[in-house]
Amino acid sequence: MQITIITVGKLKEKYLKQGIAEYTKRLGAYCSIQEIEVPDEKAPEQLSDAEMQQVKKKEGERILAKIGPDVHVYALAIEGKQRTSEQFATELDRLATYGKSKIAFVIGGSLGLAPEVMQRANDTISFSKMTFPHQLMKMILCEQIYRAYRINRNEPYHK
């Protein structure tokens, strides 16, 4: 399976880079994983609603340019569908069974995802009703993908 994680903005924090690198290294035994960072749109602190939509639209265009037509897309969003780790593992296994070999997970910037990206998504996923920095979310996602593979192979992993 080929998994792509698309994020808005460049990851700067060393501790997050190290955590993500560890999980992507572990995932190499199970799948092909690729990370794509699209540039975030520079914007002032205070934005009108119209300016916010414009920023999300530009970031969304950059995201959509990285997604092929045969890719199953998950959009990460607070309002997305929540799952247990076991349910997530079952979903990934089912996608592989039905021949969906390319999966992309999309993490938006600080303003969230553009409506166009949400429309392109085949499904949404939420890890919590809480708000997390999008850079931290990338590491949490990598851990959950790794956990899913361990669950699907009946391999031990901390609960």
UniProtKB/Swiss-Prot annotation:
It comes from the Bacteria. S-adenosyl-L-methionine binds at residues 76, 108, 127-132. InterPro entries: Alpha/beta_knot_MTases (IPR029028), RlmH-like (IPR003742), tRNA_m1G_MTases_N (IPR029026). Its EC number is 2.1.1.177. GO terms for cellular component: cytoplasm. It catalyses: pseudouridine(1915) in 23S rRNA + S-adenosyl-L-methionine = N(3)-methylpseudouridine(1915) in 23S rRNA + S-adenosyl-L-homocysteine + H(+). SUPFAM superfamilies: alpha/beta knot (SSF75217). It is an enzyme of class 2 (transferase). GO terms for molecular function: rRNA (pseudouridine-N3-)-methyltransferase activity. Keywords: Cytoplasm, Methyltransferase, rRNA processing, S-adenosyl-L-methionine, Transferase. Specifically methylates the pseudouridine at position 1915 (m3Psi1915) in 23S rRNA. HAMAP family: 23SrRNA_methyltr_H (MF_00658). Belongs to the RNA methyltransferase RlmH family. PANTHER family: METHYLTRANSFERASE, RIBOSOMAL RNA LARGE SUBUNIT METHYLTRANSFERASE H. This is Ribosomal RNA large subunit methyltransferase H. It comes from Exiguobacterium sibiricum (strain DSM 17290 / CCUG 55495 / CIP 109462 / JCM 13490 / 255-15).
